C-alpha cells in the first residue's frame, strides 16, 4: 500500500493488501475512491499547462490524471502521481501548513507528473488549484526516509518538491515526518531503550538538517513533537503483524508524548492567543482543554510561532563563525600562549637583505586575490623591536585596526607548491640550514595568514600588502616558534580525523574530544598532555588555529559539529579583544616599509627579479601602451574577444581532460570558423561630378576599359591610392580600400576594384596596434566610384633591413612620429602607412606582394587566390578518367592513399574501446588513416545533384600492426604495413592524401625520429579471413612506389653520404640548401630541448646560449659542448653586449644590470655574440603569470617592466636576426587579457618582421603526452616565413584555436582525432623496456637488461648501452602504502583505494583514502587522476617540474610498479633521447625536463624552417 523511495527504484502505491502492508507501513486514513480506471492520454506541448476552474475541479483533476498516465500504471485500481513545485492553500489562495487540513478545506497548486523514475524526462501538467485534499499520510519507515502523501477523492500524490514560496512551511512538516521515521528506526532496533538514548540517537540521525542549529535544538524539537510522533507510530499498529513492534503501549514513546518539557509549552507558557472576540485560549488549555476546533487552531498557531522562533535562532547562530561573529575575530592573547613558546629572543642575521618593496612596486590599489604568490624559505618572524614573535598572534582573516605588528625575513623564490608533510618529523622544526636559490628579503607588515591541508600536506601562507608567501622551512633560529603552530595544526587535524571516523560527527562532543586527546601516546605528534585541564587549556588558547582548519573545510556537518560550536563558545567566554573583520578585498600598497631591517642598507642580489633591459624601441612600444591604457581602462576595451577565453583558461593550466570543442569534432580541420558576412557598402546620395582623367590604359579580361586616374567630386583617385567607403552598418567604422584598378563597366558605370585595408585594432593586435598602421588583406571588392566618400593619405612603407640600418631607421621613424603628432595636434587628417599583409586564415602578417599591388592592369592577386582555392576545393575526374583531382592533389591508378578510418567498417578494422572518461586515455581507440592502393576509378551515371561526385574509387587495403593486436603494434615498426586482398568501393571524399609504400630494402638508411615523411614498407601478406600473416604468394605481385631520387639509390649502394634529411622533406635531398646552418642564440635555453630539435633538423647550430639556473645551464653545456653558455641574467648579458658595441644610449637598463655587466670577466666579454653574427634567435621567456602563478595588477607598467619577454624582444630588435622563434605555454595567448601576446607581435612588426602565430600540440609529432605550445615565428622581410609542420600522429587533445576579432578562430594544426598518418605513441611504447626500480631509486647508471621492443624505444635508445637517470623521488610511508593499494589497471586512482585505516611504523593510524579528496570530490571532477596509475595503452600526463600524487597532474604512478615515474621516463615522454644528460639533483632534473620544449616538436619546426630556406633559395635561382 506504500511507496518505496530508494535511489533509482520506486514502487507505486495501490489499494490495501496484505502483501503490500508487509513491505511498507503507515497510519491508515480515511478510505478513498478505488474504482477509478486509468486511461492513457498523450501530452501535447499545448496541454502542458491546464488552468483549473473552480466549478470544474473534479473534471479537471480527471484530465490531469489521464494526461499523466503511464503504461506501467494502467492496471492500478487507484491512480498514484508525483507532485512537484506545489503549494497547499485555503479557498482564498493563502498557503497553509499540511496540518491545517484538520480544520478546513485545503487545495493543491502545482505540477502533476507520472509516478515513474524522476531521472526520466516526463512532461507534467500544471494546475492553479485542484482538490479538495481529503487526508495526508507518511510512509517510508522501513526505508529510513519519509515519503509524504496527500490524497484527494480521485488519486494519491507523492509530494516531492515544494515551490520556493511554500518551502519554509513544508520543510518544518517534513522535519516532523523525519523525526517520526528516526524514532521508528530506533525503537524497531531496541524497543527497551531509554528516552535519553532515544533522543541522542535521533539527534545524531538528524544532525544533517539545515533548520537546526545544534544537536540540542534537535532534541528539543523531538520533545516538542512527542504527541505528533506518538500518534503517527501508534497508527502503524493497525496494519502491523504479530512479530512487529507495537508502538501504542511502548513506554518510551508514551514517555516522549507525556514529557513535561514540551517545547511549545515552555516557549509559549505566558502567551495568550485570541481565537475570536469572545474566547481566549491560554497555553494551559492547549494541554488540558477539550479538543474543540479552537483548541486545535490554537495548537497550530503555537506551533507556527515555535517554527518561527527556531528560524530566528538558526539565523542568529548561523551568523557566528569560528571564534565568534562573522563581523569579529577574537584576538589571541600572547600571555596565555607564552608557556608554549621559547623564551624571548631577537632576530639576528648577518646577511644583507633587500626591501620587499623593491621587488613589488607600491602605490596601487589592488585586490588581494591578484597579488603575486611566492615561496619563503629560511624565514623568521619578529616585531618592530626585532623580537621573535609567534605567527599565531596575527589574525587569520583580514581585520581592521590590528594592534599587532609582525614583520618577517627570508629567502624568496618562485612558488614551487611545497608544503609540510604530516608525517615528516623534520618538516616544521628542521635545524638544517638549507641553501635555497633566491634572494634574501625583509617583508613589510604581515596582514593575515592562513592554513590549508590535504591528505598528507600542510600549507601555511601569509600575506603582506605586496604578495602572498607560501612558507617553506623556517630558519634554525625560528624553528621552535613555528613548531608550536605546526603542533596545533596537527592537533586540529587529529581532532578532524577523530570526527571523521565517527558515523555521525555529532556523536563526538567537545568533552569527548578533550578526553581522547588526553589518551594519545606521547610519540604522537598531536600529543599535548595526559592531564585533562592542560589539554583543554591548550585547545582553547590556540583555538583560532583549530577553528580555522574547520572553517575552511567544505563539509557543513564538520563546520557545525558540537565540538566546533562548543570551542567557539568557550573562546567567546574568555572576553578577549575583538577585531573587526574587513569585507573589502582591495588594499592600497603603501610605498614605505616600516620593517626594522629597513634601516640596514640592502645589497643587490644577483638572483633579484631585475627590471628588464630593453632597447628604446621595445621600451617605447610597451611603455606607451601602458601609459594610454592605464589601470582605470576596463579590460573589455583592450580585447573583449579574449576575455571569455581567458576566464576559461585561468583554471585550465594545460588540462589534457578539457572538453571537446564541438567545432573540433568535424572530420575536416578548418582554420577559420564563422567567417564574417561581406559588408554592405552604403551609397552616397549627393550628386557629384565623376570623370576619368587620362587615356585608356588597357582592358580587363572582360574587355572593359581600364583607367589610372579619376576625379570624384573634389577628390582625385589614382590606382595605388586608398579611398574611404561608408558601411551600411552603424556599428562599423568606415572602410579603407586600396585601389588595384579602375574600369568602366559595360553599362557605363565607373567602377573601382580594390582590397580592404584593415586597421590594426581590427586584427589580432587589438589595441596594441599603431593607430596609423593599416594592413592589406586578401578581401577584395568592386564598388562604383560614386560610392567613395573620400581619399586618405597612405604610404606603402619600405625600410632597409638589417642591424646596420637600425639607427637610421629609428631616426626616420622618430621624425615620422613627430610629424604625425603635429598633424594630430593641428586637427589634420591622419597619415596612414602600410607595410604588411594580414591574413587571419594563415595566422600571420606577411610582406606585401609589392610586385602585384596597384598595377592597374585588371589583375587582382586576391581574386586569383580565391579562384585557385575554389578550383582546388573541387573534386573532378581527369580527361582519361583513370584518375581525379581533389584538394589540389592528383590521384592516379596505382597511387597509395590515406583513407579516413570511419569509412572502413568491416570487422578487419579493430575498434578499440575509447577511454575518454579516463585521464590520459583519450587516445585509446583512435585510429590512424587506413593506407590503401587506388585500383580503379568507377564512373557513375550522371548525378542529378551537382554537388555529388560522379564517380567512386576502388581500393585495396593495407593493414597496420595495431589492426591485428596491441602486442603486434608494440613489437612492430610503426611504418610497417601488411598487404591484403580486401577491396572497398568508396566515395572520393574518403581519401585524405597520398603516401608511398616501398620494399623494406628501399627505405631510407637513416630513418629519423620524429617521422615527418609519408613512407611505409610492406613485406608480408595479411589474410583477414584467417587472421594470419604470410609471405607474399608467388602469384601475387605488389607494385611498390617508385623511387625517383637517384641520390638515395646511390647512397644505398654505398657511393654517397646520408644527409640525415633525405626522407622527410618536400625538397629533394640533392637540393638541400648548401648554406651553412643558421648561427643561433638560444635565450632562456634551459637544458636545451629546443636547440636539440632544431640542430637535429639540420637547420641551426647553437653557438650561444643564455640560461639563468645553474643546473640547467650545466645540462645545456653537457649536451651542446660547442656552444658558449652564459649562466647569467639575460638582462646583464644584453647590457654587456650593447656596451661592447657602443650603444649604451639605446639601452634602457637598471644600475644593477650595468654594474653586473661591468663585472663580467674579459673572457666572457670576448665571447659575447654581436649583431651580424646571429642569424636565428629562439627561446621561451619565463613568466610565472603565463601559468597562473602571478598576475599583474591591472597590467601596471611598473610590473610589466620586470617581464623577461621585454628583454627577449630587445635581443631581436638589437640583433635583427633573419629568424626569431618564441615558444611558450598555451595561456600566453590569453594571459593579461591577451595584451602580452598582442604587444609581442606589435613589437616584432614595428621592427619590420613578418610574424606568424599559432598553437601546436606536441603529441601530434610523436611524443606520448599532451603539450600545447604557442609558437610565434618572425622572419625578416627578405626571408620566407615557415609553414606549420603537418601533424603526423593521432592525438585527441582539443583546444588549439586562437580567438581573433570579428568572430574568427585560427587553428594552426588540424585536429588529428579522426585520423593521421601514424598512430599515437603509447606509454608502453615509451617506457615499456625500462628495467624495474624501487621507490626512491637513486642509482644514476644501470644496465638496460633487455633489448628495445617498440619502434619508439629503438629510436629513443639509439646506441646507448648504459641507462642513465632512471631514478625517482621517494614516496613517504603512507603514500607508498596507497600506491601499493592502487589497482594495476587503466584509470585506477585514489577512488579505488579501500575505505580503511592503516597503521604506520610510528604507530599513527591514518585513513588510506585521503579524506580531503573524498569530501570535496563532487566539486572537483572527482579529483580524477590523483594517485593515478598510467595506462599502458594511453598517454603520459603533461610533464611537470615536480611529479607527485597530489600535484597538478597527479597521475604519476607506474602502470605495474609501486613508485612515481622516473626522470628518464619523464624525459622519454618529452622525446629526449636516452643519450641526453641532465644535471643536478632529482628535483633539478625533473624541473629541467618539465620546462623544456619537446625536441620532436622543435625538430618539426626546424624542418619547416629548412623548407623555407630552400624555397627562398629556389626563388632566387628562378629570378
UniProtKB/Swiss-Prot annotation:
Q: What tissues has this protein been observed in? A: Expressed at low levels in vegetative and floral organs.
GO MF annotations in UniProt = chromatin binding; DNA (cytosine-5-)-methyltransferase activity; DNA binding
Looking up NCBIfam families in the UniProt record yields: dcm
- Active site at which residues? 1183
**Where is the region Disordered?**
1-31, 641-668
* Gene behind the chain: MET4
| Entry's family note | Belongs to the class I-like SAM-binding methyltransferase superfamily. C5-methyltransferase family.
User: Protein name, please?
Assistant: DNA (cytosine-5)-methyltransferase 4
Q: Where in the cell is it found?
A: Nucleus
Q: Which organism is it from?
A: Arabidopsis thaliana (Mouse-ear cress)
**Catalytic activity as recorded in UniProt:** a 2'-deoxycytidine in DNA + S-adenosyl-L-methionine = a 5-methyl-2'-deoxycytidine in DNA + S-adenosyl-L-homocysteine + H(+)
**Extent of Basic and acidic residues compositional bias:** 1-24
Which superkingdom? Eukaryota
The alphabetical list of record keywords is: Chromatin regulator, DNA-binding, Isopeptide bond, Methyltransferase, Nucleus, Repeat, S-adenosyl-L-methionine, Transferase, Ubl conjugation
Per the record, where are the segments of Acidic residues compositional bias? 642-668
Domain SAM-dependent MTase C5-type as annotated: residue spans:
1078-1512
**Function, in words:** Maintains chromatin CpG methylation that plays a role in genomic imprinting, regulation of embryogenesis and seed viability. Required for proper patterns of CG DNA methylation in dividing cells.
Q: Where is the BAH domain?
A: 715-849, 916-1033
Amino acid at each position: 500500500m506504500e511507496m518505496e523511495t530508494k535511489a533509482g527504484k520506486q514502487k507505486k502505491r495501490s489499494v490495501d493488501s496484505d502483501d503490500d502492508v508487509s513491505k511498507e507501513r503507515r497510519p491508515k486514513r480515511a478510505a478513498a475512491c478505488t474504482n477509478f480506471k486509468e486511461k492513457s492520454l498523450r501530452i501535447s506541448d499545448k496541454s502542458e499547462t491546464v488552468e483549473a476552474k473552480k466549478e470544474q475541479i473534479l473534471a479537471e483533476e480527471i484530465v490531469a490524471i489521464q494526461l499523466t498516465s503511464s503504461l506501467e500504471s494502467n492496471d492500478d485500481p487507484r491512480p498514484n502521481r508525483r507532485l512537484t513545485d506545489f503549494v497547499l492553500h485555503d479557498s482564498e489562495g493563502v498557503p497553509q501548513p499540511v496540518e491545517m487540513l484538520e480544520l478546513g478545506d485545503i487545495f493543491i497548486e502545482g505540477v502533476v507528473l507520472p509516478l515513474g523514475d524522476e531521472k526520466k524526462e516526463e512532461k507534467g501538467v500544471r494546475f492553479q488549484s485542484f482538490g479538495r485534499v481529503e487526508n495526508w499520510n507518511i510512509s517510508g519507515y522501513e526505508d529510513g526516509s519519509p515519503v509524504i502523501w496527500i490524497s484527494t477523492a480521485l488519486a494519491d500524490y507523492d509530494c516531492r518538491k515544494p515551490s520556493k514560496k511554500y518551502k519554509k512551511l513544508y520543510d518544518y512538516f517534513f522535519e516532523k515526518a523525519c523525526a517520526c521515521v528516526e524514532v521508528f528506526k530506533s525503537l524497531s532496533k531496541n524497543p527497551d531503550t531509554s528516552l535519553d538514548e532515544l533522543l541522542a540517537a535521533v539527534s545524531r540521525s538528524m544532525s544533517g538538517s539545515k533548520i537546526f542549529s545544534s544537536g540540542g535544538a534537535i532534541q528539543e524539537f523531538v520533545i516538542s513533537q512527542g504527541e505528533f510522533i506518538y500518534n503517527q507510530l501508534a497508527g502503524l499498529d493497525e496494519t502491523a503483524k504479530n512479530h512487529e513492534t507495537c508502538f501504542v503501549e511502548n513506554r518510551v514513546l508514551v514517555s516522549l508524548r507525556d514529557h513535561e518539557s514540551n517545547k511549545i509549552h515552555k516557549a509559549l507558557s505566558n502567551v495568550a492567543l485570541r481565537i475570536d472576540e469572545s474566547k481566549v485560549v491560554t497555553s494551559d488549555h492547549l494541554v488540558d482543554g477539550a479538543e474543540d476546533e479552537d483548541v486545535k487552531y490554537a495548537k497550530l498557531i503555537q506551533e507556527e510561532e515555535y517554527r518561527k522562533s527556531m528560524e530566528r535562532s538558526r539565523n542568529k547562530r548561523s551568523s557566528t563563525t569560528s571564534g565568534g561573529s562573522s563581523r569579529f575575530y577574537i584576538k589571541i592573547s600572547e600571555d596565555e600562549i607564552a608557556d608554549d613558546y621559547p623564551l624571548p629572543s631577537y632576530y639576528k642575521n648577518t646577511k644583507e637583505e633587500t626591501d620587499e618593496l623593491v621587488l613589488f612596486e607600491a602605490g596601487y590599489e589592488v585586490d588581494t586575490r591578484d597579488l603575486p604568490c611566492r615561496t619563503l624559505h629560511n624565514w623568521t618572524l619578529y616585531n618592530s623591536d626585532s623580537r621573535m614573535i609567534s605567527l599565531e598572534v596575527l589574525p587569520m582573516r583580514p581585520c581592521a585596526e590590528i594592534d599587532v605588528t609582525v614583520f618577517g625575513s627570508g629567502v624568496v623564490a618562485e612558488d614551487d607548491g611545497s608544503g609540510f608533510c604530516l608525517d615528516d618529523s623534520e618538516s616544521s622544526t628542521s635545524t638544517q640550514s638549507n641553501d635555497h636559490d633566491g634572494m634574501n628579503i625583509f617583508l613589510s607588515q604581515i596582514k593575515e595568514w592562513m592554513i590549508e591541508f590535504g591528505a598528507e600536506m600542510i600549507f601555511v601562507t601569509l600575506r603582506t600588502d605586496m604578495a602572498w608567501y607560501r612558507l617553506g622551512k623556517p630558519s634554525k633560529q625560528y624553528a621552535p616558534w613555528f613548531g608550536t603552530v605546526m603542533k596545533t595544526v596537527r592537533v586540529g587535524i587529529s581532532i578532524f580525523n577523530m570526527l571523521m571516523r565517527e558515523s555521525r560527527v555529532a556523536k563526538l562532543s567537545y568533552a569527548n574530544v578533550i578526553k581522547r586527546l588526553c589518551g594519545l601516546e606521547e610519540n604522537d605528534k598531536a600529543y599535548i598532555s595526559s592531564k585533562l585541564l592542560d589539554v583543554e587549556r591548550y585547545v582553547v588558547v590556540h583555538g583560532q588555529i583549530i577553528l580555522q582548519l574547520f572553517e575552511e573545510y567544505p563539509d557543513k556537518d564538520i563546520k557545525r559539529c558540537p565540538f566546533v560550536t562548543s570551542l567557539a563558545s568557550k573562546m567567546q567566554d574568555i572576553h578577549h579583544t575583538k577585531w573587526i573583520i574587513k569585507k573589502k578585498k582591495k588594499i592600497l600598497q603603501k610605498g614605505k616599509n616600516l620593517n626594522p631591517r629597513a634601516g640596514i642598507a640592502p645589497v643587490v642580489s644577483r638572483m633579484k627579479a631585475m627590471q628588464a633591459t630593453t632597447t628604446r624601441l621595445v621600451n617605447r612600444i610597451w611603455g606607451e601602451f601602458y601609459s594610454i591604457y592605464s589601470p582605470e581602462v576596463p579590460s573589455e576595451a583592450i580585447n573583449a574577444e579574449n576575455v571569455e577565453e581567458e576566464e576559461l583558461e585561468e583554471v585550465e593550466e594545460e588540462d589534457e581532460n578539457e572538453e571537446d570543442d564541438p567545432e573540433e569534432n568535424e572530420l575536416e580541420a578548418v582554420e577559420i570558423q564563422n567567417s564574417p558576412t561581406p559588408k554592405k557598402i552604403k551609397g552616397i546620395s549627393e550628386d557629384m561630378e565623376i570623370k576619368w582623367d587620362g587615356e585608356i590604359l588597357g582592358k580587363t579580361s572582360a574587355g572593359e576599359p581600364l583607367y589610372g586616374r579619376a576625379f570624384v567630386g573634389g577628390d582625385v583617385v589614382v590606382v595605388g591610392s586608398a579611398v574611404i567607403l561608408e558601411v551600411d552598418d552603424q556599428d562599423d567604422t568606415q572602410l579603407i580600400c586600396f585601389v588595384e584598378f579602375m574600369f568602366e563597366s559595360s553599362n557605363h558605370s565607373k567602377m573601382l576594384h580594390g582590397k580592404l585595408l584593415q586597421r590594426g585594432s581590427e586584427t589580432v593586435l587589438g589595441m596594441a596596434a599603431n593607430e596609423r598602421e593599416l594592413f592589406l588583406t586578401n578581401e577584395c571588392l568592386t564598388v562604383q566610384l560614386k560610392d567613395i566618400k573620400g581619399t586618405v593619405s597612405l604610404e606603402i612603407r619600405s625600410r632597409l633591413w638589417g642591424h646596420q640600418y637600425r639607427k637610421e631607421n629609428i631616426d626616420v621613424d622618430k621624425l615620422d612620429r613627430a610629424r604625425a603628432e603635429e598633424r594630430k595636434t593641428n586637427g589634420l587628417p591622419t597619415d596612414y602607412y602600410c607595410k604588411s599583409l594580414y591574413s587571419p586564415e594563415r595566422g600571420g602578417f606577411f610582406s606585401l606582394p609589392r610586385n602585384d599591388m596597384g598595377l592597374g592592369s585588371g589583375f587582382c592577386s586576391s581574386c586569383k587566390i580565391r579562384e585557385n582555392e575554389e578550383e582546388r576545393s573541387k573534386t573532378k575526374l581527369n580527361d582519361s578518367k583513370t584518375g581525379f583531382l581533389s584538394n589540389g592533389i592528383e590521384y592516379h591508378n596505382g597511387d597509395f592513399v590515406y583513407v579516413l578510418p570511419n569509412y572502413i567498417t568491416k570487422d578487419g578494422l579493430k575498434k578499440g574501446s575509447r577511454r575518454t572518461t579516463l585521464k590520459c586515455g583519450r587516445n585509446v581507440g583512435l585510429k590512424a588513416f587506413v593506407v590503401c592502393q587506388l585500383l580503379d576509378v568507377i564512373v557513375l551515371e550522371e548525378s542529378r545533384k551537382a554537388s555529388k561526385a560522379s564517380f567512386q574509387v576502388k581500393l585495396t587495403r593495407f593493414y597496420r600492426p595495431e589492426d591485428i593486436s596491441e602486442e603486434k603494434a608494440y613489437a612492430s615498426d610503426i611504418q610497417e604495413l601488411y598487404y591484403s586482398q580486401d577491396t572497398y568501393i568508396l566515395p572520393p571524399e574518403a581519401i585524405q592524401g597520398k603516401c608511398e609504400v616501398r620494399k623494406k630494402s628501399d627505405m631510407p638508411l637513416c630513418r629519423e625520429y620524429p617521422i615527418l615523411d609519408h613512407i611505409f614498407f610492406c613485406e608480408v601478406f595479411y589474410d583477414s579471413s584467417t587472421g594470419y600473416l604470410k609471405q607474399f604468394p608467388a602469384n601475387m605481385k605488389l607494385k611498390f612506389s617508385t623511387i625517383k631520387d637517384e641520390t638515395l639509390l646511390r647512397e644505398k649502394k654505398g657511393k654517397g653520404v646520408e644527409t640525415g634529411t633525405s626522407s622527410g622533406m618536400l625538397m629533394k635531398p640533392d637540393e638541400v640548401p648548401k648554406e651553412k646552418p643558421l648561427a643561433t642564440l638560444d635565450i632562456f635555453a634551459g637544458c636545451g630541448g629546443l636547440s636539440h630539435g632544431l640542430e637535429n633538423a639540420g637547420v641551426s647550430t647553437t653557438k650561444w646560449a643564455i640560461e639563468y639556473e645553474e643546473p640547467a645551464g650545466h645540462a645545456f653545456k653537457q649536451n651542446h659542448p660547442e656552444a658558449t653558455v652564459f649562466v647569467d641574467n639575460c638582462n646583464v648579458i644584453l647590457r654587456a653586449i650593447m656596451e661592447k658595441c657602443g650603444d649604451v644610449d639605446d639601452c634602457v637598463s637598471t644600475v644593477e644590470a650595468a654594474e653586473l655587466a661591468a663585472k663580467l670577466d674579459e673572457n666572457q666579454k670576448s665571447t659575447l655574440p654581436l649583431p651580424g653574427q646571429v642569424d636565428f634567435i629562439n627561446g621561451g621567456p619565463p613568466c610565472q603569470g603565463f601559468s597562473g602563478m602571478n598576475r599583474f595588477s591591472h597590467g601596471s607598467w611598473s610590473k610589466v617592466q620586470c617581464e623577461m619577454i621585454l628583454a627577449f624582444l630587445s635581443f631581436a630588435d638589437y640583433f635583427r636576426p633573419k629568424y626569431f622563434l618564441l615558444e611558450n605555454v598555451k595561456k600566453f595567448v590569453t594571459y593579461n587579457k591577451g595584451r602580452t601576446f598582442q604587444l609581442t607581435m606589435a613589437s616584432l612588426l614595428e621592427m619590420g618582421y613578418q610574424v606568424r602565430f599559432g598553437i601546436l600540440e606536441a603529441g601530434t609529432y610523436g611524443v606520448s603526452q599532451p603539450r600545447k605550445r604557442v609558437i610565434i615565428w618572425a622572419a625578416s622581410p627578405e626571408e620566407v616565413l615557415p609553414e606549420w609542420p603537418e601533424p603526423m600522429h593521432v592525438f585527441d587533445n582539443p583546444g588549439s584555436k586562437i580567438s581573433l576579432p570579428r568572430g574568427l578562430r585560427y587553428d594552426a594544426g588540424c585536429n588529428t582525432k579522426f585520423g593521421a598518418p601514424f598512430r599515437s605513441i603509447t606509454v608502453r611504447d615509451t617506457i615499456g623496456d625500462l628495467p624495474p626500480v624501487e621507490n626512491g631509486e637513486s642509482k644514476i647508471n644501470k644496465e638496460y637488461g633487455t633489448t628495445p621492443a617498440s619502434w619508439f624505444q629503438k629510436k629513443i635508445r639509439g646506441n646507448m648501452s648504459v641507462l642513465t637517470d632512471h631514478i625517482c623521488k621517494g614516496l613517504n610511508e603512507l603514500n607508498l602504502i596507497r600506491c601499493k593499494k592502487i589497482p594495476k589497471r587503466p584509470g585506477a586512482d585514489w577512488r579505488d583505494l579501500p575505505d580503511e585505516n592503516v597503521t604506520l611504523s610510528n604507530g599513527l593510524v591514518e585513513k588510506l583514502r585521503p579524506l580531503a579528496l573524498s569530501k570535496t570530490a563532487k566539486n572537483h571532477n572527482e579529483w580524477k587522476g590523483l594517485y593515478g596509475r598510467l595506462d599502458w595503452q594511453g598517454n603520459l600526463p603533461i610533464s611537470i617540474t615536480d611529479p607527485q600524487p597530489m600535484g597538478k597532474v597527479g597521475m604519476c604512478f607506474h602502470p605495474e610498479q609501486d613508485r612515481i615515474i622516473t626522470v628518464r621516463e619523464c624525459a622519454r615522454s618529452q622525446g629526449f633521447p636516452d643519450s641526453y644528460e641532465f644535471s643536478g639533483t632529482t628535483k633539478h632534473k625533473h624541473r629541467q625536463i618539465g620546462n623544456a620544449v619537446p625536441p620532436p616538436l622543435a625538430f618539426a619546426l626546424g624542418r619547416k624552417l629548412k623548407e623555407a630556406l630552400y624555397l627562398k633559395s629556389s626563388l632566387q635561382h628562378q629570378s
